[in-house]
Amino acid sequence: MSIDDLKSKIPDFAKDVRLNLSSMASDETLTPQQKYGLFVACGIASRNADVRKALVAEAAGKVDASVIQAAKAAASIMGMNNVYYRFVHLASNKDYRTMPARLRMNVISNPGVDKVDFELWSLAVSAINGCGMCIDAHEDVLRKANVTAEAIQAAVRFASIIQSAAIALEAADTE
């Protein structure tokens, strides 16, 4: 399955989603590694099998397997961190902020790819998962690494498009 296959499954009520998928596929704001890593990480984070399969397949022929593995790791580790840190951020009891997380997250310091790319993928997945604390932390790391606001915005735009594709497919499944 490819992005074109995915677009063909998007119903007419979500025509904008199809158009956004097309623009995302041809976007050149990011490096190929950043772009296809986002496809994989956000496809997994969308929790939709069709979206995940299409985007992983799209990336498979365009980047090294290590990029795909690292993007999978970003989605996985953010699945854990986004839940934990969203709780810490939203809980009325601020004592949780001073407690050690006691969660293993070694992959963040040694992702096997450029750390900036891994941070970009982590930011996008954090946006999908709605963890404001994680969004702020990853955006700060990216800005300190001189990543442009346009690149950061592109990553979050990709995340929003990918998530909307998953929702459109779920909505179509109710017809």
From Swiss-Prot:
UniProt entry keywords in alphabetical sequence: Antioxidant, Disulfide bond, Oxidoreductase, Peroxidase, Redox-active center
Enzyme Commission numbers on file: 1.11.1.28
Catalytic activity: N(6)-[(R)-dihydrolipoyl]-L-lysyl-[lipoyl-carrier protein] + a hydroperoxide = N(6)-[(R)-lipoyl]-L-lysyl-[lipoyl-carrier protein] + an alcohol + H2O
Positions annotated as active site in the UniProt record: C131 (proton donor), C134 (cysteine sulfenic acid (-soh) intermediate)
Stored InterPro entries: AhpD, AhpD-like, AhpD_core, CMD-like
GO molecular function, one term: disulfide oxidoreductase activity
Keyword Oxidoreductase found: yes
Gene3D superfamilies listed in its UniProt record: AhpD-like
GO BP annotations, alphabetical order: cell redox homeostasis; response to oxidative stress
Disulfide bonding pattern of the chain: C131-C134
Family label: Belongs to the AhpD family.
Function: Antioxidant protein with alkyl hydroperoxidase activity. Required for the reduction of the AhpC active site cysteine residues and for the regeneration of the AhpC enzyme activity.
Name of this protein: Alkyl hydroperoxide reductase AhpD
